[in-house]
Amino acid sequence: GSEMCIRDSFYFHRIMKAFLGEPVGTFIVRTRTEAAARLLRYSDMPIADIAYRIGYSSPSSLSKVFKQFYGISPLEYRNNKNFVIMKPAIIRPELELKHEIKEVPARNVIYLRLFGDYKLNDYCSAWMRLCQFIQEEKLPMGEVMPYCIYHDDPKVTPAEKLRTDVCMVLPSFATAKGDIGFKQLAAGRYAIFLYKGPYEHLQAVYDTIYGKYIPEMECSLRDESSAERYLNNPADTAPEELLTEIYLSLIHISE
């Protein structure tokens, strides 16, 4: 138990650094905003529909973030065909991601909430604390696959107020104690993408999900925190064999 936990905490730390210095939260927001830009340019979809499709609760939320990224409103961008977005998406149509839409049951988690810049959080210590808590409270060992939830949009929320929950999924209930919380993640419908390959290609994976898969799927993203699970350990796995699960919460268009 503890040896595996210690080993896995280092692996978790490596994963969080694998995004080439860009925190996951910023990365997801930027990718969503670029997806909006593509839909504005290449589709006739109304701006409100685009906002809901990529997971914003209102067109004004999308407009605010879009303006912060590009200095121009979604409507101005749609009407000004000469405006070029600096970072082109890396859509790889040949990238075959296994994906399924799945009803995920409720899950029990213990978690440590971190406040502050996603880049500066000490994920390693947080994971170690969860492992220590399990041993102290004599709880059954949870999943050794780290599960992280990012609650805030770093383009809208000041860095010091950003909230991250580092979670361990448990087989049973636990009682919160001190700064370690317990909660049940609600059951829900998710698009779950399974990517096999090196972490440095995750940007292309997200771009491909938002640019290719989401527009083709008959569903919309819920305005909710996304999550990731890391299924194996880079310390003893070849980069091309690494498995990453990406969870995106869904609503069906018929809802």
Give residue spans per PLM region.
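A solvent-exposed interaction/effector surface
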Residues: 10-18, 22-30, 34-41, 45-48, ...
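Short, small-residue-biased leader/transition segments that mark boundaries at the very start
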Residues: 4-6, 255
